């Protein structure tokens, strides 16, 4: 007797779910975009100096012209290793790499959530500095990584 009652309750609750209807209504959406923004392509210049293997040695620089309606700019490693640190990896031997950080023209470390104060049409250069402690021989080769340029639009 208990089995039959349980089955009837299950069937009764199944039937009530099958009859559920969804009421929908469309609402119009309208928005205005007031400013166009076109990010300029930055110029990336590798360093060919002898100090690349030293801590703080210049590895490469990123230069750009600040577009209109921008108050801050930041440049940071796409694959952030540890709080703003990137890794340049030798394309011929991935066991060879260089840890680096990017700083603005005043030497402040750049991160993705804050940038350097700028004015429109200003030329600004960010520097990628060797963050590996001590002096280290860096074998010649092509070292790759990716950086992101962030613009804070007014």
Curated annotation (Swiss-Prot):
Subcellular location: Fimbrium
Keyword Zinc-finger: no
A GO cellular component annotation in the UniProt record: pilus
Alphabetic keyword roster: Fimbrium, Signal
Primary subcellular site in the record, as a coarse category: other
InterPro entries assigned: Fimbrial_Assembly_Comp
Protein name: CS6 fimbrial subunit A
Native species: Escherichia coli
